[in-house]
């Protein structure tokens, strides 16, 4: 339950009721990590093709953990992709999961009398030859890169040392050793000789920090990259390379803000991404930008912001073309067709729950979108029939009454519920007296500012300088300046 909860009555507002619960520990905000998705409509091959490197493998593993129907297929794909790397430990882990999933599928087939046995159900055997060969190759490459780096340091050539650290970081990342990869990429900072090198170092650190889910580190290095002269000093039209870098930084920042549950800030970052320069498969796909940005904007933007920043955005329109369902949801919401909008949201919920970065926020975002729809629906009315309102939101009157009561308690709707007649009444606010109160407060503020300006002008005109009082312990000491001033006053 959000904090604080405010209770209103007709005579006036009473003190808000405080509940001693940390919002982070609130079960409503806590993500459910043990959920199962039964009916996804996900094209796994197309989905995996949108990513590269470790991100592709991690996303496939996440799908396997939460979707029984896609588990075996996702693990088989992850197993084939991991064999293109030096990550032997992950290969063995995925193979173990695949063996367990396959045995489970076989047991289900044996228990079902009408089931037709599938070909290729047996898991592939553990490729021990590949494991041993890959371990040796990884060790030899590590020794070579380490020797090269020592030679570069002996020659004291900064550019070679920087590249040596980057190569070592790339190798550690390929082996799945994220902590050592982060150390190597960070050490390259001391050997950067241009803004381009600093940006490259920041992007490498950001990438590994996302894999480690160290979101404060991500935002810190996004800020460092944006403050480099190559990015900060360019105004107006940017060249293609700079725009591509800026898009990567905004995507990473949007992902970090999403993880921190700062949905409005996440939407603002993602809306600044350029479609023509969105090429960051190590972290996000353009479809992710459309979904994350669209849902966060729906949950936090008012109608004017939604129209100005999303619907009228020429760049974000191109992202939405990749996800027509999200585009239609945004337009239905803006056109106040809330029943259709919420129905379409429910239809795509299963697929969203298979996204490793969005899944923990789906319930919260859906609740905020629904609450914003209820608030916008009621805002123009003095009273509203809850039967018609329930029909508009495709729900029951009893469920709607509970939702409205919660919104009133949270102070999001200024209204009262007539439970007998099932009518929602807006609280009677005297607009005339409210306007007079605002006018009086504004007048007092103008008076205060005018008096302050007149006082400052008088002080400057009369050349009055107010000296700060002497520091403690320095009263008995004489400096040349105050010694001379004391002598002049004595004379």
UniProtKB/Swiss-Prot annotation:
Classification of source organism: Eukaryota, Metazoa, Chordata, Craniata, Vertebrata
Keywords (A to Z) from UniProt: Cytoplasm, Nucleus, Phosphoprotein, Signalosome
GO cellular component, one term: cytosol
Function field: Essential component of the COP9 signalosome complex (CSN), a complex involved in various cellular and developmental processes. The CSN complex is an essential regulator of the ubiquitin (Ubl) conjugation pathway by mediating the deneddylation of the cullin subunits of SCF-type E3 ligase complexes, leading to decrease the Ubl ligase activity of SCF-type complexes such as SCF, CSA or DDB2. The complex is also involved in phosphorylation of p53/TP53, c-jun/JUN, IkappaBalpha/NFKBIA, ITPK1 and IRF8/ICSBP, possibly via its association with CK2 and PKD kinases.
Summary of subunit composition and partner proteins: Component of the CSN complex, composed of COPS1/GPS1, COPS2, COPS3, COPS4, COPS5, COPS6, COPS7 (COPS7A or COPS7B), COPS8 and COPS9 isoform 1. In the complex, it probably interacts directly with COPS2, COPS3, COPS4 and COPS5. Interacts directly with inositol kinase ITPK1. Interacts with CAPN8. Interacts with USP48. Interacts with ASB4; this interaction negatively regulates GPS1.
Domain PCI residue range list: 269-431
Protein name: COP9 signalosome complex subunit 1
SUPFAM superfamilies assigned to the protein according to its UniProt record, in alphabetical order: Winged helix' DNA-binding domain
Bilayer-spanning residue ranges: none
Biological process per Gene Ontology, one example term: regulation of protein neddylation
PTM sites of type Phosphothreonine: 479
Record note on domains: The PCI domain is necessary and sufficient for the interactions with other CSN subunits of the complex. Mediates the interaction with CAPN8. The N-terminal part (1-216), which is not required for deneddylating activity and CSN complex formation, is nevertheless essential for other aspects of CSN complex function, such as repression of c-fos/FOS expression.
Subcellular location: Cytoplasm; Nucleus
Protein's gene: GPS1
Disordered: annotated span: 465-491
Residues found modified as Phosphoserine: 468, 474, 483
GO molecular function (one): GTPase inhibitor activity
Main localization (coarse): cytoplasm
Polar residues: compositionally biased ranges: 476-491
């Amino acid at each position: 339950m959000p904090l604080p909860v405010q209770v209103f009555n007709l005579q006036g507002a009473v003190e808000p009721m405080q509940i001693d619960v940390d919002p982070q520990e609130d079960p409503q905000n806590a993500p459910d990590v043990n959920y199962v998705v039964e009916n996804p409509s996900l094209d796994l091959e197309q989905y995996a093709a949108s990513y590269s490197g470790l991100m592709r493998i991690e996303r496939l593993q996440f799908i396997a953990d939460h979707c029984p129907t896609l588990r075996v297929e996702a693990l088989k794909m992850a197993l084939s992709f991991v064999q293109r790397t030096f990550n032997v430990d992950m290969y063995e882990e995925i193979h173990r999961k695949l063996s367990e999933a396959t045995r489970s599928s076989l047991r289900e087939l044996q228990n079902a009398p009408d089931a037709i046995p599938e070909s290729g159900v047996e898991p592939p055997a553990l490729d021990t030859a590949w494991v041993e060969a890959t371990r040796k190759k990884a060790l030899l490459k590590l020794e070579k890169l380490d020797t090269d780096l020592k030679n570069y340091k002996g020659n004291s050539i900064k550019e070679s040392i920087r590249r040596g650290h980057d190569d070592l970081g790339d190798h550690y990342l390929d082996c799945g050793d994220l902590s050592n990869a982060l150390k190597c990429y960070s050490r390259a900072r001391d050997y950067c000789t241009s803004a381009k090198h600093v940006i490259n170092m920041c992007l490498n650190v950001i990438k590994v920090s996302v894999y480690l889910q160290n979101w404060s580190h991500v935002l810190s290095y996004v800020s460092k990259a944006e403050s480099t002269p190559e990015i900060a000093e360019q105004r107006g039209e940017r060249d293609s390379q700079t725009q591509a870098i800026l898009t990567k930084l905004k995507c990473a920042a949007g992902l970090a803000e999403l993880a921190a549950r700062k949905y409005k800030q996440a939407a603002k970052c993602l809306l600044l991404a350029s479609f023509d320069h969105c090429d960051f498969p190590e972290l996000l796909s353009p479809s992710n930008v459309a979904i994350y940005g669209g849902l966060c904007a729906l949950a936090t933007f008012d109608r004017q912001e939604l129209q100005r920043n999303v619907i009228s955005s020429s760049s974000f329109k191109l992202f939405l073309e990749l996800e027509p369902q999200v585009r239609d949801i945004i337009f239905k919401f803006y056109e106040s067709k809330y029943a259709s909008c919420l129905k379409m949201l429910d239809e795509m919920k299963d697929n969203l729950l298979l996204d490793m970065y969005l899944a923990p926020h789906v319930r919260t975002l859906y609740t905020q979108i629904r609450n914003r729809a209820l608030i916008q629906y009621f805002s123009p009315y003095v009273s509203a029939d809850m039967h018609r309102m329930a029909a508009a939101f495709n729900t029951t009157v009893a469920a709607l009454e509970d939702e409205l009561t919660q919104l009133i308690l949270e102070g999001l709707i200024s209204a009262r519920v007539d439970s007998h007649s099932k009518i929602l009444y807006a609280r009677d606010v005297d607009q005339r007296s409210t306007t007079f109160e605002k006018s009086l407060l504004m007048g007092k503020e103008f008076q205060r500012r005018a008096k302050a300006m007149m006082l400052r002008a008088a002080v400057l005109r009369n050349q009055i300088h107010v000296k700060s009082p002497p520091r403690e312990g320095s009263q008995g000491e004489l400096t040349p300046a105050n010694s001379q001033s004391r002598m002049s006053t004595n004379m």
